[in-house]
């Protein structure tokens, strides 16, 4: 679409600056432009992905931390600084189709991989926090039948993550619930692509997705706007 291409072209000419703009801002640029996103670093334009890999810090705090269970991006501190939701940055980077052995440098100098971050996310998984971005990440990297125990010994699975997200009210979700519906769509699509017939939590997810597609279309104007 010409308008989409024009929007991408215009946006690509806006450069954020490392150490000025926050990791939260920079990661949203990565969500849109992925490997093509560039930052201003010391007045030169450089790959934002390589900047993330290099283990930078923001306001004295490391972007990437080594943990007992693997690694993670720095969790929430204040709004719009680091992650706004558990595993948000991992979910964003999953859209760039990074391999599981893709490496990052942690603040302590350790080498952390995508797989390390996935393992930490499994260990920290719980139903007291948002699971949207965890589901988003796992749907990109894990088989729909994956099961594990978190660090408290509680049993989890991809299906339980899907069911937890299905049970959340769309209106109460971040950004009007669109992220939750997107995560459910990723998980449902991966389930179907693995050769399964929709059933259980995945059937519930499919019904919820279709319901809100229908509701959205009902509010759409003839010119495509809302």
Positions of the model-derived regions?
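Preference for long, amphipathic alpha-helical scaffolds in soluble/luminal domains
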Residues: 1-226
């Amino acid at each position: 679409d010409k308008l989409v291409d024009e929007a991408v072209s215009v946006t690509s000419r806006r450069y954020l600056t490392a150490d000025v703009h926050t990791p939260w801002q920079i990661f949203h640029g990565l969500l849109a432009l992925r490997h093509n996103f560039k930052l201003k670093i010391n007045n030169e334009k450089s790959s934002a992905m390589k900047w993330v890999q290099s283990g930078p810090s923001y306001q004295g705090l490391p972007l990437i931390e080594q943990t007992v269970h693997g690694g993670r991006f720095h969790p929430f501190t204040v709004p719009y600084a680091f992650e706004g939701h558990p595993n948000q940055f991992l979910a964003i980077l999953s859209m760039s189709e990074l391999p599981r052995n893709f490496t990052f440098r942690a603040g302590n100098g350790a080498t952390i991989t995508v797989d390390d971050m996935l393992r930490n996310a499994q260990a920290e998984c719980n139903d007291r926090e948002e699971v949207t971005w965890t589901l988003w990440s796992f749907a990109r990297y894990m088989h729909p039948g994956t099961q594990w125990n978190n660090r408290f010994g509680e049993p989890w699975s991809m299906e339980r993550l899907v069911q937890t997200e299905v049970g959340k009210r769309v209106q109460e979700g971040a950004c009007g619930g669109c992220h939750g519906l997107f995560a459910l769509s990723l998980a449902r699509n991966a389930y179907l692509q693995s050769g399964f017939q929709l059933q259980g939590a995945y059937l519930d997810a499919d019904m919820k997705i279709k319901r809100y597609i229908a509701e959205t279309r009902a509010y759409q104007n003839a010119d495509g706007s809302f």
